[in-house]
Amino acid sequence: MRNLLVSVADSDGGNQSANRKILFSDVVITGTRNNWGRKWRTIDVQVASWVTFVHVLALFAPFTFTWDAFSVAFVGYLLTGLVGITLTYHRLLAHHSLKLPKWLEYTCVYFGVLAAQRDPIFWVSMHRYHHQYVDSNKDTHSPINGFWFSHMGWLFDSGYILEKYRERKNVEDLKKQPFYMFIRKTYMWHILGCGALLYAWGGFPYLVWGMGVRTIWVYHLTFLVNSACHIWGTQAWNTGDLSKNNWWVALLTFGEGWHNNHHAFEYSARHGLEWWQIDISWYIIRFLEAIGLATNVKVPSEAQKLKKSTSTYDKALK
């Protein structure tokens, strides 16, 4: 199977050909990782089987539609996508952009667990490696290996991850907390339990919409930040990588699409740095801060932004 966003190229020795541009972008595929003709480990088959299952489940959506089922999916989108992944997995855990009381942190994290994007230790580790090695051969999901790989192909390629990060030593802050180790060891039971509860609550329609539709919707929105936001959009800051600000991804992902801003100031709890850059996650963080639940909220100072903008201007002149 070929990357549909890349002009067809001949394969060579089991590797996909490099140095092809992704359509409608200036991103050149320089990596040679073969997405299909490689060794598939047991975990790769398991992850691919699960992802296939939820996509097939979602195909029943037109035949099981009710407004109640749709509402379950929409609320699930907000809880797992906005609260769980964007605000908690990403801005809180991966970047320490803010602090929450432990009871609230763990509650919000659990919504992220139900997004079925792996346990917090795995997710945060991969994301921190992404920032450490962004758009290099050691990046976890860069489009230099093609759109498909950066979007979701990397999820099915544990060999690629093991080759580069055999020991995940960048999440010791999470490993020392029993809650996160418990979630890691019992992860799939929480996903299966969620599915069972949805079925018991509303039958097959709730399972289709609350598990299938909601899960793949949040999947692909999250994955678009990894793929589209490193391919299409604009760069306000010279970050030395492919990160882009993409307005339509930002609208769908509660502010995550202001990705070039994020790579310029990865510690910032605010991604939409301009007044017109809608960042729903930031608005929620500000609310939590106003009522005393969010503390140590980090944002770049005007001096830091000026320094970065000056650096960007100087590099543009060279």
Give names to the regions the model predicted.
Residues 1-223, 228, 268-318:
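Non-catalytic, topology-defining segments of multipass membrane proteins
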Residues 226, 260-261:
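Asparagine-centered polar/low-complexity signal
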